[in-house]
Amino acid sequence: MPLSIPWVVKLGGSLALSADLPLWLEALAESPVVVVPGGSLFADAVRVAQQHWGFADELAHAMAITAMSQYGQMLQGLCPRLSVAGDPYSLTRLLEGGQSAVWRPDAGAMMDERIKASWDVTSDSLAAWLAEQLGAERLLLIKSTLPPGTCHIQQLVESGLVDREFPELTRGSAREIWLCGPGQHADLRAGLEHPDRFFRRVIPMSASFS
């Protein structure tokens, strides 16, 4: 029977220089999850270079995905208990062995017309895409800040907490999307078991405001 993957967890690049980053990594290594790295300061460098030289969005997109891979390498270097893999099969095998796995994305392996070569598609959307490829039950976004009030997906876009294509890549999916924020690394393991007690549920596009 194929392995059921309960969680894909996107670790925000904004945490790259946080003193809490090692604590998050140790917490992630405690439960078998797939970790999607943000672009972090590596993607910021791509933005700066594109603004200076004006090269095409297609190149910037591929470089930003490489930036995610670089951040993933850094995460594994900081926490050797985490493994690294680049394709769904290898990620699944690692989880079958009880390990947490950091995804190292490859732009050439993501030939999907929904993944636009644009800054409107960031690691949030790619985490949603990977969760779909893996058939994961839930997606958790770890952010350095959380919005006040209701977490409707469109409000997250407007506040800049997720990218503009995230609503489309998650539209119509039955997959649950959750948020957690600063200082919650201590609650991560319990939250993965009981997300409604520790995390904040994201209301998808198909749902109405309440």
Briefly describe each language-model feature range.
Residues 1-196, 206-209:
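Nucleotide/pyrophosphate-binding catalytic subdomain
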Residues 201-202:
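An anion/pyrophosphate-binding glycine-rich loop and adjacent beta-alpha core
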